[in-house]
């Protein structure tokens, strides 16, 4: 084993904040609301800011400061239209990022399904890397279950369930009693107040259809 530092390329799933105009106040209020709605999920979360749709100059210093104070960690800027904009963002402390255009790669080999038989209590986090996650019990409020694949919960989901954590859009979330704080697939999420009441406390399946979350009731 080498005792020297090593520098390697890698990839991560990050949240992207898409700005529609150059109003810094609007952007900051938006991220503040998100952190207040789900502080355990968003607090200290890294975020990339996409400015491709912004017309006019942005106050990058105020943007970075405001997003940081709201609770996020601003990582960088993407979608800058010219070198001048890139320089302004860089001078404010933002990294300049671009979407990768790497060739299509074979899907990673899935790991065996992770099965948990005990209740997932508040404050606990369970992660199934490169595979599916099966919970044969309840997930309490304040608990978090994460999988790079799909999640099956044979009990009540009161906490947070995050499937497709590495970007797998075909992932699903199936639970026998939906009372979640947050449900997410491949970075798309709903908070509890965004879940239609007809699906509350029901056996359901969550999927991603045309880049939008879709819930359907399952027969018992």
UniProtKB/Swiss-Prot annotation:
InterPro entries: CAP/MinC_C, MinC, MinC_C_sf, MinC_N, Septum_form_inhib_MinC_C
Keyword Cell cycle: yes
GO biological process: cell morphogenesis; division septum assembly; regulation of cell division; regulation of cell septum assembly
Keyword line: Cell cycle, Cell division, Septation
SUPFAM superfamilies: Cell-division inhibitor MinC, C-terminal domain
Pfam families in the cross-refs: MinC_C, MinC_N
NCBIfam families on file: minC
Quaternary structure annotation from Swiss-Prot or TrEMBL: Interacts with MinD and FtsZ.
Record's function text: Cell division inhibitor that blocks the formation of polar Z ring septums. Rapidly oscillates between the poles of the cell to destabilize FtsZ filaments that have formed before they mature into polar Z rings. Prevents FtsZ polymerization.
Protein family membership: Belongs to the MinC family.
Official protein name in the record: Probable septum site-determining protein MinC
Species the sequence originates in: Vibrio vulnificus (strain YJ016)
């Amino acid at each position: 084993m080498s005792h020297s530092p090593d520098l390697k390329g890698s990839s991560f799933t990050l949240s992207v904040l898409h700005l529609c105009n150059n109003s810094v106040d609007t952007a900051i209020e938006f991220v503040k609301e998100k952190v207040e709605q789900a502080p355990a999920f968003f607090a200290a979360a890294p975020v990339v800011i996409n400015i491709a749709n912004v017309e006019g100059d942005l106050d990058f210093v105020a943007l970075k400061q405001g997003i940081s104070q709201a609770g996020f960690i601003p990582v960088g800027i993407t979608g800058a239209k010219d070198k001048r904009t890139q320089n302004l963002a860089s001078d404010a402390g933002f990294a300049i990022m671009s979407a990768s255009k790497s060739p299509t790669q074979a899907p990673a080999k899935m790991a065996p399904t992770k099965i948990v038989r005990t209740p997932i209590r508040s404050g606990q986090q369970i992660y199934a890397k490169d595979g599916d996650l099966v919970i044969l019990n309840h997930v309490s409020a304040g608990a978090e279950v994460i999988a790079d694949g799909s999640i099956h919960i044979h009990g009540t989901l009161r906490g947070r369930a995050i499937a497709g954590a590495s970007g797998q859009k075909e992932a699903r979330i199936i639970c026998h009693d939906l009372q979640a704080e947050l449900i997410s697939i491949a970075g798309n999420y709903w908070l509890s107040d965004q879940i239609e009441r007809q699906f509350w406390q029901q056996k359901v399946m969550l999927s991603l259809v045309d880049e939008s979350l879709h819930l359907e009731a399952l027969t018992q």
